Amino acid sequence: QKYQGDDELLPFYYYDIYIGDTPIGKISIRIGNNYHSYYNGHIGYEIDKQHRGNNYAYRACKLVLQVAKTHSMCELILTCDESNIASYKTIEKLGAELIEIVKPPKEYFAYREDMEKQRIYKLCLKK
């Protein structure tokens, strides 16, 4: 699926992740940059609980990096909750560098009082 974007959300592509004929998760890649993308990141993924621990998120991320390159993006911001060890290990395996760990400001469109600090990474894309 493709979403055109609005004032808060960047345009994005949304894909189902399959192993054979079995859907095991979802991944999205957001195109461009705005204030919110620093905290929301350019890639979002979710792997069904019974399929976690198999590097499927990593492999799906590697595939959608090609979409970013097609859109002439040179770097991506990748984020996750500070406590999400599996996610930040995936991000680090992709070669992203940690910029900071920070609680998003109240101006962030998805802000909640109880939200965790976010690990914010930068991934430079090779041409």
Name each region found by the language model:
Residues 3, 9-127:
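Acyl-donor (CoA/ACP) binding surface of acyl/acetyltransferases
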